[in-house]
Amino acid sequence: VKKILLIISVFLLSGCLGMPESVKPVSGFELQKYLGKWYEIARLDHSFERGLSQVSAEYSLKSDGGVAVINRGFSEADNEWQEAEGKAYFVNEDSEGYLKVSFFGPFYGSYVIFELDQGLDSESYQYAFISGPNSKYLWLLARTPSVEPAVIQKFIDMSKERGFKTENLIYPQQK
């Protein structure tokens, strides 16, 4: 019985670490330029962020070489901030924008960065297009609470080309 449960667990978890066929992680990724605070500009709807506005993510280096993750958003329904702490690790080499992230014990999901921009500040990336394990998970993150319309259009175009249902994007309010 334990062996069967282990096999099922491995099968289920491996499915969470995949990525859509059409998505390829960025190469030449530099973690130091990714650390810090990001604002959620757009996303596809999913239960763990439903109803949240002013969503942000903060990434910092862990002592074991991984990444500490703090996601935060305001729930209008509950009139309070909600926060989730997690951890992320590179799936392959650290120069590839492909990480696994966990907010609950040993269960990891894919975090695939498929587009980045440094903008004028070479010290940090300015926006990131991110996919999860399948085409139901998609985010546009930026260093500022708003971005130029051209960035949003690029995100929509690149995401649509990769099979994401961009007509279902949500644009959470940022203050």
Predicted regions span which residues?
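Sec-dependent N-terminal signal peptides
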Residues: 4-13
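A beta-rich soluble binding module of mature secreted/lumenal proteins
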Residues: 16-175
